[in-house]
Regions:
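NTP-dependent small-molecule kinase module
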Residues: 147-175
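Glycine-rich phosphate-binding loop used to anchor ATP phosphates in small-molecule kinases
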Residues: 56-100, 104-110
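Walker A/P-loop
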Residues: 15
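Hydrophobic anchor at the beta1->P-loop junction of P-loop NTPases
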Residues: 6
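ATP-binding Walker
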Residues: 12
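A glycine- and Lys/Arg-enriched "phosphate-lid" helix/loop adjacent to the NTP-binding pocket
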Residues: 102-148
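Conserved substrate/cofactor phosphate-moiety recognition/catalytic segment
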Residues: 19, 23-65
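Conserved beta-strand scaffold positions in the cores of enzyme catalytic domains, especially
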Residues: 27-29, 103-105, 163-165
Length: 175
């Protein structure tokens, strides 16, 4: 059993998959987005931004931050799942030993912003970040996330990282 890194855009199914794997197997879960929010709030000078849309500078800095965590994890017998919406494949790949880590990216490159919007609004709760967004702002954000999904899918293909397309739903996460 290897450690698992799950990256990808917001609302793609990363946390859902991580929670399922933790329930079924003996994994510890590290949601990097919690740390991203903490960096933004407590250490703004570091320049790590906790936005829904991945930022190149944040991706690079978070990957470097995680490199130490990954190094420590690599020396333990415990198994971990790290998930993040703030790290691009090209930034994290240099820190993950593929003999010790399975790497997955999840996104929705083959949908429209309207289709994804309807799915999100149908299933969201008042705890979801999307609940606080106006329809117009959410549609604009989804347009950007679809573009990022397409780029990450392309990068994953070039880097030999498994990419899971949840454009048609999240059923494939459980196969």
């Amino acid at each position: 059993m290897k450690n698992i890194f799950i990256g990808g855009v917001a609302k793609s199914g990363k946390s859902t998959l991580a929670k399922k794997l933790c329930k079924d197997e003996k994994y510890n879960h590290i949601p990097v987005d919690y740390f991203t929010a903490s960096f933004k709030r407590n250490y703004p000078d570091v320049g790590i931004i906790s936005n829904v849309v991945v930022n190149e500078e944040t991706s690079t800095k978070l990957s470097l931050f995680l490199s130490t965590v990954i190094g420590i994890i690599d020396t333990t017998d415990e198994k971990f799942i790290i998930d993040s919406a703030h790290i691009n494949p090209k930034d994290i790949i240099k820190y993950l030993d593929r003999d010790k880590w399975d790497i997955y990216y999840i996104g929705y490159p083959n949908t429209t912003k309207e289709e994804k919007f309807n799915i999100i609004r149908k299933y969201e709760t008042n705890d979801d970040w999307t609940y606080k967004r106006s329809d117009e702002v959410l549609l604009d954000t989804l347009d950007k996330l679809i573009d990022i999904s397409k780029k990450q899918e392309k990068d994953c293909l070039e880097l030999g990282i498994e990419y899971v397309d949840t454009s048609l739903g999240m059923d494939m996460l459980y196969d």
